[in-house]
């Protein structure tokens, strides 16, 4: 969480914020700054989702993940997005242009794992699946859909692989088989810079005690159908009891962030890496 983000992703998220006319112009009286509550609230594993009837592809994906972990490729890709490296764009082939294609479904609203600049995809997941397609000798096709339909697209046979910063859990395992994990994540809160509610918190239990003290007048935003939603609203399949706050879903964490700047919600909850990107983009870092 302490590593600097790359300028390309920061600029891309800043463009998203400007596009909705809200960067550095919040009307909440707190100025234009936000902060990360730097306490991990969950422990999660990211993995790729594969169709349940495609054991051959699952085996190939797991072999590829083991290979990129062992030979340093995964570390090199992570360095591009969490360190000083330069992200490499990935361009989707036209679906159906050939018979030898790997069709990957994603939701390109989750930097630094998947995002778009024009027609080019960037992100940890996108570079990984490009490497996988090359390894398999296939053309890469990327389908960009709403997050809540990513795994269902694989389940229905519209795509071979789901790559969207997917947290492994039993609910999603009903739709797809998960590969071995390639990234460990957790949920973090974003607050306005002058918010003091969590200033004395040292542990996840401390943060949860504060969250439990809030009532429905406190609104917390999240990207819809992500772990953040289930953490806030509660979900037995995810093992979360939830809180008595009002949850509000968005198409992306960036949109939740700008709505917080506008004073419409109190906090945002999202995975660690996107949280840092959003905070740094809003704060102009």
PLM-predicted stretches and their roles:
Residues 33-42, 130, 139-211:
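Acidic, polar ligand-binding/catalytic clefts
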Residues 31-58, 108, 183-191, 272, ...:
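Periplasmic-binding protein-like
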Residues 1-12:
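Bacterial N-terminal signal peptides that target proteins for export
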């Amino acid at each position: 969480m302490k590593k600097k983000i790359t300028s390309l992703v920061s600029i891309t998220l800043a463009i998203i914020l400007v596009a909705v006319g809200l960067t550095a112009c919040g009307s909440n009286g707190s100025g234009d700054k936000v902060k990360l509550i730097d306490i991990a609230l969950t422990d999660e594993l990211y993995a790729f989702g594969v169709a349940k009837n495609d054991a051959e592809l699952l085996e190939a994906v797991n072999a590829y993940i083991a290979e990129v972990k062992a030979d340093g490729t995964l570390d090199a890709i992570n360095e591009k997005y969490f360190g000083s490296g330069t992200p490499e764009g990935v361009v989707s082939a036209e679906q159906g242009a050939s018979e030898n294609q790997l069709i990957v479904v994603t939701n390109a609203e989750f930097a630094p794992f998947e995002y778009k600049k024009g027609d080019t995809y960037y992100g940890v997941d996108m570079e990984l699946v490009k490497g996988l397609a090359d390894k398999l000798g296939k053309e890469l096709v990327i389908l960009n859909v709403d997050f809540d339909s990513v795994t269902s697209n694989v389940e229905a046979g519209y795509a071979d692989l789901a790559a969207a910063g997917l947290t492994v859990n039993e609910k999603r395992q009903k739709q797809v088989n998960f590969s071995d994990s390639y990234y460990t994540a957790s949920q973090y809160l974003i607050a306005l810079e002058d918010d003091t509610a969590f200033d004395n918190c040292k542990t996840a239990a401390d943060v949860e005690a504060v969250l439990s003290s809030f009532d429905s007048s406190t609104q917390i935003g999240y990207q819809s159908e992500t772990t953040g939603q289930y953490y806030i609203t509660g979900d037995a399949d995810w093992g979360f009891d939830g809180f008595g706050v009002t949850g509000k879903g968005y198409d992306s964490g960036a949109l939740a962030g700008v709505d917080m700047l506008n004073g419409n919600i109190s906090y945002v909850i999202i995975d660690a890496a996107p949280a840092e990107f959003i905070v740094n983009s809003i704060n102009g870092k």
